[in-house]
Amino acid sequence: MARAPLGVLLLLGLLGRGVGKNEELRLYHHLFNNYDPGSRPVREPEDTVTISLKVTLTNLISLNEKEETLTTSVWIGIDWQDYRLNYSKDDFGGIETLRVPSELVWLPEIVLENNIDGQFGVAYDANVLVYEGGSVTWLPPAIYRSVCAVEVTYFPFDWQNCSLIFRSQTYNAEEVEFTFAVDNDGKTINKIDIDTEAYTENGEWAIDFCPGVIRRHHGGATDGPGETDVIYSLIIRRKPLFYVINIIVPCVLISGLVLLAYFLPAQAGGQKCTVSINVLLAQTVFLFLIAQKIPETSLSVPLLGRFLIFVMVVATLIVMNCVIVLNVSQRTPTTHAMSPRLRHVLLELLPRLLGSPPPPEAPRAASPPRRASSVGLLLRAEELILKKPRSELVFEGQRHRQGTWTAAFCQSLGAAAPEVRCCVDAVNFVAESTRDQEATGEEVSDWVRMGNALDNICFWAALVLFSVGSSLIFLGAYFNRVPDLPYAPCIQP
């Protein structure tokens, strides 16, 4: 007994469903009998079909800088009026919306003009919604790959302006007129609409502005009806954190190592050149990585590339400086003569200006033990040669100091033994050689000090050049910001 009411209800439901289906089928036959999807929905040939357009961005997939290609995922909302599809829901069981395949209805054939892969149309032919009163809505999804001219001047602190240009493929400006859609509040949606709930944020790019504009042009024919383009500008700003962590910070640290070459001794020119050249090679690797990322263009040089070239120039100058300092430090008095002016500037003036400590003074040697005077040695020699007692020789020496000479003493000096003369000559030679070696050592030490002074000067010059140059290069990126355009942000906070 309990199953009977249940069966009756099920039968009534099926009958009701069948009646509803018949009404929809009847509406379909009513609308599409003698309907031609190839003709425009106008009563007169000179009438214009008004197309309301709305573009909703769901995902900014990527921007390939190398190929200058922007890949986006969008929904294209298209609304228009077709008087041939006009009906009243009261005549067809209260049906407000009829869904029909898109190939059965006239379409404005909107395509993306600046696509790069030849896919002008949409990705999926969704059904067309026909509403009471002849209003038609088509909302197909599409994945577009469009051309985007990449400006690499401030890479990786750059922003790009990529455009999506829509137009009707077969209809001119007199046959089809484009307008922007309006929201529920009656405001015109003259920008790319972004649904924050469905939008997937890109990890590399942030969208700042996405205004739209409708432009009518003649396409080269001044007397023709012209064409209408709907241009959406997608102004995106790069998020530079990835490049700062993986390229800029390692590059700055490696470039700073070239300054450590100045902390090596001036005579270690080979080691200093090795350090500088290794840094130069590392910078070349970073420059190669950047060249693989940016497009092959000669219009501008990227900011990071300018920084690497600048640091490579500094490293090259440091290598040249190391060679010059090594050449100066290895000079000797036999090959080069030091001018007094150069000595004054590099050894006296510049150390005082740079605050360098003066060279340490050589410790004074302790006074040697008192030796016998040369007069005593001569007296002993005369005593042996002349066979005279020491008292007489001393007396003759006193007379010599008083200005009187004896012929015997002069004859004794003339007849001095050859052995004594050889010893005196040897002593004089040793003394003269010692004086020459001391003078040569002092001059060699002056050349080494001059090399150290040049090294010190070049260190401060390289430090100032590296710091100021790097700051000026990256300071340009700070001022490269998206201009304050008179548009509302795409993504409202």
UniProtKB/Swiss-Prot annotation:
The UniProt record lists the keyword Kinase: no
Name of the protein described by the UniProt record: Acetylcholine receptor subunit epsilon
Family the entry assigns: Belongs to the ligand-gated ion channel (TC 1.A.9) family. Acetylcholine receptor (TC 1.A.9.1) subfamily. Epsilon/CHRNE sub-subfamily.
Main location class: membrane
Gene Ontology CC: acetylcholine-gated channel complex; neuromuscular junction; neuron projection; plasma membrane; postsynaptic membrane; synapse
InterPro entries: Neur_chan_lig-bd, Neur_chan_lig-bd_sf, Neur_channel, Neuro-gated_channel_TM_sf, Neuro_actylchol_rec, Neurotrans-gated_channel_TM, Neurotransmitter_ion_chnl_CS, Nicotinic_acetylcholine_rcpt
Catalytic activity: K(+)(in) = K(+)(out); Na(+)(in) = Na(+)(out)
The UniProt record lists the keyword DNA damage: no
Subcellular location: Postsynaptic cell membrane; Cell membrane
Effect caused by changing R167L: In CMS4C; significantly reduced AChR expression
Annotated gene: CHRNE
UniProt-listed CDD domains: LGIC_ECD_nAChR_E (cd19030), LGIC_TM_nAChR (cd19064)
Coiled coil stretches, renumbered: none
Disulfide bonds: C148-C162
One of the protein's GO biological processes: monoatomic ion transmembrane transport
Subunit-level organization: Pentamer of two alpha chains, and one each of the beta, delta, and gamma (in immature muscle) or epsilon (in mature muscle) chains. The muscle heteropentamer composed of alpha-1, beta-1, delta, epsilon subunits interacts with the alpha-conotoxin ImII.
Organism: Homo sapiens
Reported impact of S163L: In CMS4B; fails to assemble with alpha CHRNA1 subunit of AChR
Domain of life: Eukaryota
Cytoplasmic side: 265-272, 329-456
Effect seen on changing L98P: In CMS4A; rare example of recessive inheritance
Region forming the signal peptide: 1-20
Extracellular side: 21-239, 292-306, 481-493
Transmembrane segments: 240-264, 273-291, 307-328, 457-480
